[in-house]
């Protein structure tokens, strides 16, 4: 193991409760056990739904599944590692706080054992693409070691931190849920792609959501770098409240320093790197993502040529305006990661709307779709599904969309979209909603959509 064990204070002879046995909980429990902690894992789902439980039991880790017995938690525990999705209103979390037990998320644990620099990336939208681009650019240079992706992107941070060497860099996608549970976490480089209203059902207010995002920089010093979207006034104001060295990036404006785009080209410190048309992914939002990633790459001395070549050959990540395939002259795109209105608006900006059939819908969080209406104007057809299908249909009517249909789910919308389209059109799944009304997560939603598209080619 390559982790920096001497930094970790909750290991030998210490009792630790891991709450939630998802990917991050499983990895955290294994790491803590290896560090010598007395680990107890608790998950509300029964054993037969948690195959990881058997592996932990074989290691000697205590696992309690199927319920949350409140008497399990007492003052003998020195730490709780909480799954990011579990709210702070959970009885276990509240009891831990009452007992004075620190409550962290797995990314804090990863920081404690990591021997290499961490690049932390957060924001409402663009986190995954920016994280992927950043890792790609860092690995395109001649740097020692490897840039390793971790965090909310799907690779448990504690596992990656264990495996990383001192020459590596960990590029970590961080959600607001994860950032609420940090104490000493300090990235050497941090990126905030943007901040818009989101996850109010979890954070209760926009102020609390922004506060969680801003935790990213709370331990940074002038020796660290904070890369911010200068198009957002809110981030420009927040930049005055950090000790880190601030590096801006912006679209459609000239910056004396930093990454920017202007008149169809991308620049860094006023030196042209590439034309926007040379990017391998479409859309103005992906220009922003590229600028953020370039900002990190230039800090590490990556050449303009390496950046240009890597971004030209990067065609996106799964479920983010992902090209699925073509059938009967129609191109299909999977943007299942678009779990909010802004993400769908950004996706729409990359398409010719009069040749686009949009598939949207999902979990009803009570959001108004009025702000989506301007972006819907000009679309050829709209297919809605899920809990929000009726309200999205109303928004489509207000936008003047000539053809609006409903479907049972995302995959059922595929043959309907085929009927409503013609050769040369694009069909885009960009739900503008979370997936949990019909699917376990946005990845499964996207996979079901892609399976339905692939069936078309088999049946032809």
UniProtKB/Swiss-Prot annotation:
It is found in: Cytoplasm. It catalyses: UDP-N-acetyl-alpha-D-muramoyl-L-alanine + D-glutamate + ATP = UDP-N-acetyl-alpha-D-muramoyl-L-alanyl-D-glutamate + ADP + phosphate + H(+). It comes from the Bacteria. GO terms for cellular component: cytoplasm. One of its GO terms (biological process) is peptidoglycan biosynthetic process. Keywords: ATP-binding, Cell cycle, Cell division, Cell shape, Cell wall biogenesis/degradation, Cytoplasm, Ligase, Nucleotide-binding, Peptidoglycan synthesis. ATP binds at residues 123-129. NCBIfam families: murD (TIGR01087). Belongs to the MurCDEF family. This is UDP-N-acetylmuramoylalanine--D-glutamate ligase. It comes from Enterococcus hirae. The gene is murD.
């Amino acid at each position: 193991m390559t982790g920096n064990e001497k930094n970790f204070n909750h290991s030998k002879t210490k009792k630790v409760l891991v709450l939630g046995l998802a990917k991050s909980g499983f990895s955290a429990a294994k790491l803590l056990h290896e560090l010598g902690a007395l680990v107890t894992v608790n998950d509300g789902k029964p054993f037969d739904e948690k195959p990881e439980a058997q592996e932990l039991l074989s290691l000697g880790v205590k696992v309690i599944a199927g319920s949350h017995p409140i008497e399990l938690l007492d003052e003998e525990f020195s730490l709780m590692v909480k799954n990011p999705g579990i709210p702070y209103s959970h009885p276990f979390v509240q009891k831990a706080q009452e007992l004075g037990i620190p409550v962290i998320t797995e990314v804090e644990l990863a920081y404690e054992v990591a021997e290499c620099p961490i690049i932390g990336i957060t924001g409402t939208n663009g986190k995954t693409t920016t994280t992927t681009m950043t890792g790609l650019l860092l690995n395109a240079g001649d740097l020692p070691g490897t840039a390793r992706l971790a965090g909310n992107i799907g690779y448990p941070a504690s596992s990656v931190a264990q495996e990383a060497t001192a020459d590596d860099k960990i590029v970590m996608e961080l959600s607001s849920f994860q950032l609420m549970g940090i104490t000493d976490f300090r990235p050497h480089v941090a990126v905030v792609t943007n901040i818009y209203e989101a996850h109010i059902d979890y954070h209760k207010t926009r102020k609390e959501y922004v506060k969680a995002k801003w935790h990213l920089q709370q331990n940074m010093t002038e020796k660290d770098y904070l890369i911010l979207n200068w198009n957002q006034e809110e981030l420009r104001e927040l930049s005055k409240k950090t000790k880190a060295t601030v590096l801006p990036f912006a679209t459609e404006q000239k910056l004396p320093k930093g990454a920017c785009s202007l008149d169809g080209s991308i620049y860094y410190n006023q030196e042209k790197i590439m034309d926007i048309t040379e990017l391998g992914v479409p859309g103005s939002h992906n220009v922003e993502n590229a600028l953020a990633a370039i900002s990190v790459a230039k800090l590490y001395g990556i050449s303009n040529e390496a950046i240009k070549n890597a971004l030209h050959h990067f065609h996106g990540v799964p479920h983010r305006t992902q090209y699925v395939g073509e059938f009967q002259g129609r191109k299909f795109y999977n943007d299942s990661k678009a779990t909010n209105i802004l993400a769908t608006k950004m996706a729409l900006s990359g398409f010719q709307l009069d040749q686009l059939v949009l598939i949207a819908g999902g979990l009803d969080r009570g959001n108004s779709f009025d702000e989506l209406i301007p972006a819907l104007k000009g679309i050829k057809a709209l297919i809605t599904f899920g809990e929000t299908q009726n309200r999205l249909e109303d928004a489509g009517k207000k936008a003047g969309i000539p053809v609006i249909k409903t479907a049972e789910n995302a995959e059922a919308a595929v043959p309907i979209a085929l009927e409503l389209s013609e050769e040369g059109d694009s069909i885009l799944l960009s739900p503008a909603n979370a997936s949990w009304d019909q699917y376990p997560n946005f990845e499964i939603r996207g996979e079901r959509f892609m399976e339905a598209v692939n069936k078309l080619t088999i049946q032809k």
